[in-house]
C-alpha cells in the first residue's frame, strides 16, 4: 500500500480492500485484482469516498452483479465500486409503481412486482444481473425492455453530486443508453400495470421455459 491507499483503508475499514481478487464477483469466476475495491454501505459513505479520492484522479469502475462482465487476468487499475446491501432495497410506492435500489437483482424485482399484482415486469425474471446494469444496458427480452417501465433514476456523479433523471431525458437504444460514464445509478422508479399474481406467474413461467 502507498500513503494514500493506507489513509483510505484507515478511513473506510472493512469496506475498502486493496488488491481484492475480482474473480469471486464474476459469474465466470475469472479476473485479477482491483487496485482499490470499495463497497459502500450507503449513499452517504459513497459520497464521502468519492470526495476522498477526487484529487487522485483514479479511474472509477462500477461492478454490478458480474453476470455480463469479463475481467482481465491482469486486474483493474483504479477503483472498483460494488454497491452494498443498502442499495438493494425495494418498496411499493403505488399500486403499479415501485422504487428499487440499483444493486437489486432483476429477478427479485420481477418477483416483488408479481407479489404486489404488478405486471409488465415479467421479462426481468429472464435477465441475469442487477437493475443498475439493466438500465445502463437497456436490457430486455421477448419484445420488452427496461426503458418501457422506467420512470426515473437517481444518480451520483464522480464529484458526489446527486440528481434525478426522468425517462424522457435519457436516450435509449438497442442494449444501451446515453448516460454519462461518470454516473453511478443509486435507485430507480419503475411503473407497470395492475394485474393478478396468477397471471403474472404464468407469464414468468412461459418466458423462462
Question: Residue ranges of each PLM-predicted region?
Answer:
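Structural signature of FAD isoalloxazine-binding scaffolds in flavoprotein oxidoreductases
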Residues: 32, 38-43, 70-88, 136-166, ...
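Anion-binding (especially nucleotide phosphate/pyrophosphate-binding) glycine-rich loop
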Residues: 2-131
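Residues in well-ordered beta-strands of folded domains
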Residues: 39, 82, 101, 124, ...
Amino acid at each position: 500500500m502507498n500513503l494514500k491507499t493506507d489513509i483510505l483503508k484507515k478511513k473506510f475499514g472493512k469496506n475498502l480492500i486493496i488488491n481484492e481478487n475480482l474473480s469471486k464477483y464474476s459469474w465466470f469466476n475469472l479476473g485479477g485484482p482491483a487496485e482499490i475495491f470499495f463497497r459502500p454501505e450507503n449513499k452517504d459513505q459513497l459520497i464521502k469516498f468519492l470526495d476522498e479520492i477526487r484529487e487522485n484522479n483514479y479511474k472509477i469502475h462500477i461492478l454490478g452483479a458480474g453476470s455480463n462482465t469479463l475481467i482481465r487476468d491482469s486486474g483493474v487499475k483504479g477503483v472498483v465500486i460494488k454497491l452494498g446491501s443498502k442499495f438493494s432495497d425495494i418498496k411499493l410506492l403505488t399500486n403499479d409503481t415501485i422504487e428499487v435500489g440499483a444493486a437489486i437483482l432483476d429477478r427479485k424485482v420481477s418477483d416483488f412486482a408479481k407479489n404486489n399484482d404488478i405486471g409488465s415486469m415479467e421479462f426481468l425474471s429472464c435477465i441475469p444481473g442487477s437493475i443498475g446494469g439493466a438500465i445502463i444496458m437497456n436490457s430486455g427480452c421477448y419484445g420488452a425492455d427496461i426503458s418501457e417501465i422506467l420512470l426515473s433514476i437517481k444518480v451520483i456523479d464522480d464529484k458526489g453530486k446527486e440528481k434525478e433523471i426522468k425517462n424522457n431525458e435519457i436516450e435509449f437504444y438497442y442494449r444501451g443508453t446515453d448516460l454519462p460514464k461518470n454516473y453511478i445509478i443509486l435507485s430507480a422508479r419503475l411503473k407497470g400495470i395492475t394485474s393478478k399474481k396468477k397471471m403474472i406467474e404464468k407469464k414468468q413461467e412461459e418466458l423462462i421455459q
